Amino acid sequence: MVEARNLHGRTRGDRRRYRTESDGPAPSGKDRSLPTTAQASGIRVVGDSQALKLHVLDSIDEAQTIWRSFERRAVASPFQTYAWLSNWYANVGHPTGVSPVIVFGYDQSERLVLLMPLGLAQAKGPRTLAWLGDGLAGYNAPLVDPALLQSFSPQAVDAIWQRIIDHVGSVDILRLRRQPRMLGQFHNPFVHGAKVSGAGGGRLLVLPSTWAEFAAEHIGEGRRTGADCGRYLRQRGRLTIGLSLPTQPRSRVVEKILAVARSQSGKQSRYNPLQQAGVGTFFKALALSESTGFLNVSAVNVDDEMIAGSIGYVHGNCYYLAVTSIEASDDGAAAERLLFEELIRSCIVQGIKSIDFLGATPAVPQWTGRPAPLYEAISGCSLKGQAVVGLKWAGRALGLSTSEHDAFGSGVRQTFKA
């Protein structure tokens, strides 16, 4: 059962902050920090044992306090943290015409249990609603309270999407990509009805409690160990290994890593975020931010020249290895093995439970399992959107389209350009 107040009949100017005088006060109780510009809209979604009231905000800055507070107790990846998405919006989203649509879900006790960071792309072509950060995020998903995941039904998710689309208005396409099958220990109800996409997630390495355990099982795998590689590199020059670099060196190393990694797509996994406009500025801004303690930048240098480097994120007892830069040489191959072993050792010491090789191929494939499946769903919400989606799926069936950015996809957008 779904109950909702009629939200239609407003002009776009009326919806700019998604609030009117008739909307009523912001919620009280445990989550009083909801910004006053959020809409107390009365959208009510009833699931199996959860009744959610949705509130929508179109300002990332005004959502900061409640977002940061909620992400500390919610199930989420680093790609849905405020630090990540606020930097993404400033450097990638806003310049490309994406408008934020931040959805808060409250339970019957007015406790925040759901946060859906969405973006509406409307600069050109069909108006597309997608996860905020789409195209750069390794995984797209909401932030969810663990208690909600225990009872949340796919039918409730469908109702939420319908209410959001009705509220935003004039949405042509709902596009949901790179969605993981699991949210923490729970099945992700937001992949209900979605298809397995061609792009996979990262290869997961589950870490033991001690380095000795890892060494006993894995160090003999491969032609050379990290120790062998270290001895080899010391013969080449002065070897330095920097893990978790501080802010200023971190920014300079990020520039080097991105410059090399862009030209070495073969060393990347299927997740390669470096082709999107504004990504370089995004990573540098993230590296310089003192508030982003989860960002990890590491490098192996010989005579002060970077041979291998990586950018990763620590979140929820998992290290997400997102970008790697390896020199195409014997020195680079040795530095890669040494860097990965040192990262693994450091993670074990810090008590991190796993490493997700999201943007890299493990130095030794036997270390990890198969890539995790990711799910995508794309649906037309208007006649224009249905036509675009139909052409896109037809193109894929004919083998003409493999991504949103290829020639066929561009042609489809031009055909229906607003």
Enumerate the language-model features and the residues they cover.
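Short, cationic low-complexity segments
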Residues: G169, R224-Q235, A397-H405
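Acyl-donor binding region in acyl/amide transferases
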Residues: S99-P100, D107, A121-G198, H315-E376
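Active-site/acyl-donor-binding loops of N-acyltransferases
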Residues: V2-A51, I60, P180-E217, N296, ...
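A generic secondary-structure signal for well-formed alpha-helical elements
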Residues: A74-P78, V168, D172, A261-S269, ...
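A conserved beta-strand-loop-helix scaffold within acyl/acetyltransferase catalytic domains
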Residues: L52-L129, Q179-G201, A216-G332
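Short, flexible turn/loop "capping" segments at secondary-structure junctions
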Residues: V46-G47, D134-L136, L233-R236
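Short intrinsically disordered coil segments
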Residues: G133, V157-I160, A216-R224, K392-A397
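Short beta-strand-to-loop capping motifs
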Residues: V144-P146, L205-L207, L245
